[in-house]
């Protein structure tokens, strides 16, 4: 079914290269039609709009900018690579590029349609909702090892590959996919600093539509995961995983930490949502925060160009909330997406073992017996 769905949507448009000289408008459909590869897709006729940003120096990622620069020179101690680096290494055979765009329910943006309109050359589409746990009602929860391996194998990702993930906002959902690969033992993964907006603002080409191969791989990944959860055999599974349990927390672990704090708990949501003065974007979710947690909104990790801050500036952000880098830290958010941005910031500071509460606030707030704090409750 998924393959047919992709064919209707993607094959309707020709595969072409959009050069920087063409007008570029930001895609913003009037209605959000789908967050899943299995949903019905409408047309994607809106183009992108360019913004003007100054290029960021490659020095920020600790690698040089020159054509043919080997991917082996990138350190896994850095969570990001620059658009200049990616452009120089775009044709490396062992480099996989993933468009992992995903948006909040109230944003009314369709990442699949936006991928059709414009994506970085060679990029595959990584469906955050499709490559997820199919046995829970919580959104995009971490899949099983076997399911993740099946999805990556269907996408054509090998263990020898370096993986660069980007999204349509700058740094947003790509951080979650960066974390997912690390949870399953693949360390050779980075986020594109500034994402697709930065890529386009730097004058680099994007492709419109998608090749038949990319369509089939994206469709096959979701279908493979569905089969795994139905108990069916999927072959071949070529991507090997090694689960890292210390990077993901469950509800019980958060409860235990609340009662006996051993980890500093940071929340990536906005201050208004944390305080309970703004409603949650998902209906039926209580407002407030987990007792004992501290609020560090994820945009504090970025500079004005929506790229990751230098280490010294990142440290200031955590110092302001009395978060010590010498003590254990865990992170949460709304559904386990933007918490990964805080983990990226801490990764740049050398703290590479920050777990994410996968269910995050959406899981916690839907449990009526669990305590919450808010401005009202504390006043």
Curated annotation (Swiss-Prot):
The modification N-acetylalanine is found at residue 57. The keyword Calcium does not apply. Keywords: Acetylation, Mitochondrion, Pyruvate, Repeat, Transferase, Transit peptide. SUPFAM superfamilies: Rhodanese/Cell cycle control phosphatase (SSF52821). Expressed in roots, rosette and cauline leaves, stems, flowers and siliques. Induction: Induced during senescence. It is found in: Mitochondrion. Residues 91-208, 259-373 form the Rhodanese domain. The active site is at residue 333. It holds the Pfam family Rhodanese. GO terms for cellular component: chloroplast; cytosol; mitochondrion. Changing residue 340 to V: Reduces thiosulfate sulfurtransferase activity 4-fold. Slight reduction of 3-mercaptopyruvate sulfurtransferase activity. Its EC number is 2.8.1.1, 2.8.1.2. GO terms for molecular function: 3-mercaptopyruvate sulfurtransferase activity; sulfurtransferase activity; thiosulfate-cyanide sulfurtransferase activity. Disruption phenotype: Shrunken seeds with unmature embryos. Residues 1-56 form a transit peptide. Its main location: mitochondrion. InterPro entries: Rhodanese-like_dom, Rhodanese-like_dom_sf, Thiosulphate_STrfase_CS, TST/MPST-like. SMART domains: RHOD (SM00450). Changing residue 295 to N: Slight reduction of sulfurtransferase activity. Changing residue 305 to E: Slight reduction of sulfurtransferase activity. It catalyses: thiosulfate + hydrogen cyanide = thiocyanate + sulfite + 2 H(+); 2-oxo-3-sulfanylpropanoate + [thioredoxin]-dithiol = [thioredoxin]-disulfide + hydrogen sulfide + pyruvate + H(+). One of its GO terms (biological process) is embryo development ending in seed dormancy. It comes from the Eukaryota. Catalyzes the transfer of a sulfur ion from a donor to cyanide or to other thiol compounds. Substrate preference is 3-mercaptopyruvate > thiosulfate. Involved in embryo and seed development. This is Thiosulfate/3-mercaptopyruvate sulfurtransferase 1, mitochondrial. It comes from Arabidopsis thaliana. The gene is STR1.
């Amino acid at each position: 079914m998924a393959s047919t769905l992709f064919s209707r949507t993607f094959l309707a448009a020709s595969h072409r290269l959009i050069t920087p000289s063409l007008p570029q408008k930001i895609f913003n459909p009037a209605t959000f039609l789908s967050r899943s590869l299995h949903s019905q897709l409408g047309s994607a006729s809106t183009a992108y709009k360019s913004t003007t940003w100054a290029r960021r120096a490659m020095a920020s990622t600790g690698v040089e900018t020159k054509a043919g620069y080997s991917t082996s020179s990138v350190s896994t101690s850095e969570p990001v690579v620059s658009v200049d680096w990616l452009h120089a290494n775009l044709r490396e055979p062992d480099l996989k590029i993933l468009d992992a765009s995903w948006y909040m329910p109230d944003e009314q943006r369709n990442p699949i349609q936006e991928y059709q309109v414009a994506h970085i050359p060679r990029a595959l589409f990584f469906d955050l909702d499709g490559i997820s746990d199919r046995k829970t009602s919580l959104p995009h929860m971490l899949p099983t090892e076997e399911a993740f391996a099946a999805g990556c194998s269907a996408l054509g990702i090998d263990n020898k590959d370096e993986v660069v993930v980007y999204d349509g906002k700058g740094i947003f959902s790509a951080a979650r996919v960066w974390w997912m690969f690390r949870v399953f033992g693949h360390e050779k993964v980075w986020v594109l600093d500034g994402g697709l907006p930065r890529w386009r603002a730097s004058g680099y080409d994007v492709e419109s539509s998608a090749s038949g191969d990319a369509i089939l791989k994206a469709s096959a990944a979701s279908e493979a995961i569905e089969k795994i959860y139905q108990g069916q055999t999927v072959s071949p599974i070529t991507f090997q995983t090694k689960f890292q349990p210390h990077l993901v927390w469950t509800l019980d672990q958060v409860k235990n930490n609340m009662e006996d704090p051993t980890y500093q708990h940071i929340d990536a949501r906005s201050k208004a949502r944390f305080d309970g003065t703004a409603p949650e974007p998902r209906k039926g979710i209580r407002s407030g925060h987990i007792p004992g947690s501290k609020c560090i909104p994820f945009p504090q990790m970025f500079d004005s160009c929506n790229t990751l801050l230098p280490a010294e500036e990142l440290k200031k952000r955590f110092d302001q909330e009395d978060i010590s880098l010498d003590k254990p830290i865990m992170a949460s958010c709304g559904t386990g997406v933007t918490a990964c941005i805080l983990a990226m910031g801490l990764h740049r500071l050398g703290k590479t073992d920050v777990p994410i509460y996968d269910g995050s606030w959406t899981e916690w707030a839907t449990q009526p017996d669990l305590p919450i704090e808010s401005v009202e409750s504390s006043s």
